[in-house]
Amino acid sequence: MYLSVVTGFSSWLGNIFSDLSSLNQINLKINYFRSYLEYPETFNRNNGVTNPANDCPKEIELKNVSYRYEGANHHTLQNINLKINPGEHIAIVGLNGAGKTTLVKLLCGLIDPTEGQIFYDGIDIRKYNRDAFYRLFSAVFQQFSILPVTIGEIVSETTPENIDYDKMKRCLTVAGLWNKIEQLTNGVDSQFGKTIYDDGVEFSGGEIQKLLLARAMYKNAPVMLLDEPTAALDPIAESTLYENYNQISFQKTTVFVSHRLASTSFCDRIILIENGKICEEGSHNELLKQNGTYRMLFETQAKYYKNNLGKTEVAE
């Protein structure tokens, strides 16, 4: 009987500590949610320029832009001066943590610079109605969330009765996903994910990237931002994307972020960011001739592939 009491007490005590741990985790989540709700709204959402020209891309300019994340001891980006011409295809490259994604977020207004100004069509983006400004951009980010709705609703971001199905098919085809969708029982009307629907479809990481790319194309905004859009693609799918890049970016300003330097050679201009600053810029060939950091990184990646190819041939 004594042993039963001790065992029961130990189990009861263990459950208490487990519940306290769960309560602490829930409390942290609640505090995080509260801090989000209490975060001051700095964006201009109630007034401002409500009709920025979105029929064609305009000039984008960053003047002395710096950004430091809240609580950080140093700036992620420092004194960035950059002008992007209408319809220009820009590549942003650099090592991990260089500030590439932060720069993309600044361009589309997800965050405002700590210092400096960003202009779209000669107007400081803070003067735009922020919701109207967001409509100028189609973006594919590394971090994303997809709602459990139909594939058609994901791509079009609208209700089924408002979907342009011909346009959606073209976008899915260029993104390399139409053959997959066509084989599904309900096609674009298939529910995505099994969070709510047991018969929902699930995609691989590469297929999700294609889906997000199709969504960005469907929006047909004048500026397209692609942050590592090929990170989860297999080599064949990646090659197909590069072959279709001109079709994807036709008459648009595009900003292509990648750590694979061979994938940026088709861009008009390449911006190399190092330690939060622009250290080199130019075309692929121009940067190779400079014998700088870009060339060193490019040759390092090329050497890796050559060495692996040599090992494969020896093994055979």
Can you say where each PLM-predicted feature lies in the sequence?
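ABC-fold ATPase nucleotide-binding domain signature/coupling loops
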Residues: 178-211, 220, 304-316
